[in-house]
Amino acid sequence: MPQPGIRPQIAPNPPAGPGDLNNDLLNSSQWTDQQVAAAGIPIIDIPFVTFGGGIGSFVTVDYLRIRGVPPEAIRVLTPLNTPWESYEYLTRVSQIPRQERLRSDSASTPDNIWGFPSYAVREAFSAKGIKNKLFPLWNVATEPIFSNYYTPKAGAAFESMEKEMNRIRYNEMVVRGQVRMVRKRFGGGYFTVLTPPDGASRTRRIAYRSRFVHIAVGYAGLKFLPDLEEYRTKYNDFSRVVNAYEQHEHVYQTLQGRPGTVMIRGGGIVASRVLQRLIDDRDRLGLQTQILHVFRTYITGSHGDSIFMRRKGGDGWAYQGFNYPKSVWGGQLKSQMRKLEGEQRAALYKAMGGTNTPVRNSWQAQLRRGRNEGWYRTIVGTMDSMTPGANGTIRAQLKTAQGPLDGNVDFVIDCTGLEADISEHRVLDDLLVHAGAGRNPIGRLDVERTFEVRGTRNFDARLYASGSATLGGYFPGVDTFLGLQIAAQEITDDLAKVGFCGPLGVARSTAQWWRWVRNRQI
């Protein structure tokens, strides 16, 4: 049996329990059925497995069900209770509760592959009063010239996904647990190894044997800035120096009880949201909160490499309606990126990338007032070090163009949102080592235009991936609502070519849309 890419164990493995992974399996890049059986791991046959269980899994399953694949042929392996659970957690801690609006456009509807009726149309129909009904329609009709881009409320997105989840019988396909690894099966197919919850199975692991696997694990992990991590670890202070993507409600509650100074780091959408929360609390409760905002790069106006790749800016911020220019989802940038390889693709990603935030009149008015009244100040520089200061404060030392600058603050909220390397995710790292997967030009998981993970095909079996782990591929907007749907369409188009699901032609699409409109279960 061929065993390419055997990886030596750095540390001894714990003794294998009943139905657990043993050294033979851990060290083998391809498994036989006999190897798995000898380890006492039960094997379950299922044609299509998706794991992660977030919105990426949800929209892919939605496409498959609409294309006629029965629930019995699909399994969703996930620790999540709902597909939007992780996403809602991240939005909530980064100050986007259900009543606030997301950074997504009207037609990016994960519950509706057709995009119509859009969120704006639905909001208009459900609103009370003529003014409230006309507002979303007028907004999308005049954006972005006479109004800011329309964006849906987070709660509307989650509620509509719940409705579609029930319509496609999503929960019938869900198996609870944490995926440990995916390995190629000798002779074709894959084994996806699941660790079920305690007490849910008589064995430690279960192996799902399938022809198709889809990976949608979301972000590989959160990466903290070195100075932030050093301070937290050295001084065991995880409450005053926080990342915006972790639970930090205590910061706002403390400031509601006494005056304080907060340092904000970062210039993206999360920084905008954190500032809004601080200023809303200040206005609503009459607080005396002082805000220091540190920009590493201060934007004073329009900027970019050429007149065709320019972005508005001002007061430190780079402005853009969405994560990427809208043409990446269906215009010239999507077409251009699809043709590029290697360094050329990486260069275009760099040109399109960079931290940015949408223009919202309410935010700009808040910050303008803060600058005029003196309680919101900006600093251009980088953090040199942080140490405990007097009276329970943090002494922050900055490097600026004018020289060193230091001062004491009560809290530091880091809003840079750095993402960890894919090798820090156990399953993705295992794919790199054992499955033949590689990295794309910017270091993420390398996928084909069909979102098949390059180098992992096993005879007629295919392994796909979508979401942020694949950023850097032939399609840029992968970690967005619409991007996940476009990836799901590409994947299911490819599956239709090999006969796993039906084509989505005009007749079937129209019939299925009509079923969606009437909320008819499929």
Place the predicted regions along the sequence by residue.
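Flavin (FAD/FMN) cofactor-binding and adjacent substrate-gating region
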Residues: 100-143, 325-329, 333-341
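Conserved N-terminal glycine-rich FAD pyrophosphate-binding loop of Rossmann-like flavoproteins
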Residues: 79-117, 300-320
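Flavin (primarily FAD) cofactor-binding/catalytic cores of flavoenzymes
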Residues: 1-81, 143-269, 273-522
